[in-house]
Swiss-Prot record:
Expressed in mammary, salivary glands and prostate. Also detected in lung. Mainly expressed in cancer cell lines of breast origin. Highly expressed in lymph node-positive compared with node-negative tumors. Detected in all lymph node containing metastatic cells. InterPro entries: MUCL1 (IPR054050). It is found in: Secreted; Membrane. This is Mucin-like protein 1. Glycans are attached at residues 23-24, 30, 34, 46-47, 51-52, 54-55, 59-60, 62-63, 66-68. Residues 1-20 form the signal peptide. Its main location: secreted. Residues 25-68 are annotated as: Disordered. Keywords: Glycoprotein, Membrane, Repeat, Secreted, Signal.
């Protein structure tokens, strides 16, 4: 009987946690609250700067993360860590 009670409590807690954390994120609001009028064109400098900033940031973060990542797994034996590198087993 205790086992059944534990299973019910576990199921209820999982349900409550999943209800609080949605699996899909809501789309972000990408439009400014106040923008240029319909007949007014956006400034070329502002548009170019925003485009450069958004394209440069992800590339830099990816490069930094890939160069600092460790290649081996310290917890496992050395021969297990060598398997992804293409080395032959002992």
């Amino acid at each position: 009987m205790k086992f059944l009670a534990v299973l019910v409590l576990l199921g209820v807690s999982i349900f409550l946690v999943s209800a609080q954390n949605p699996t899909t994120a809501a789309p972000a609001d990408t439009y400014p609250a106040t923008g240029p009028a319909d007949d007014e064109a956006p400034d070329a400098e502002t548009t170019a700067a925003a485009t450069t900033a958004t394209t440069a940031a992800p590339t830099t973060a990816t490069t930094a993360a890939s160069t600092t990542a460790r290649k081996d797994i310290p917890v496992l034996p050395k021969w297990v860590g060598d398997l992804p590198n293409g080395r032959v087993c002992p």
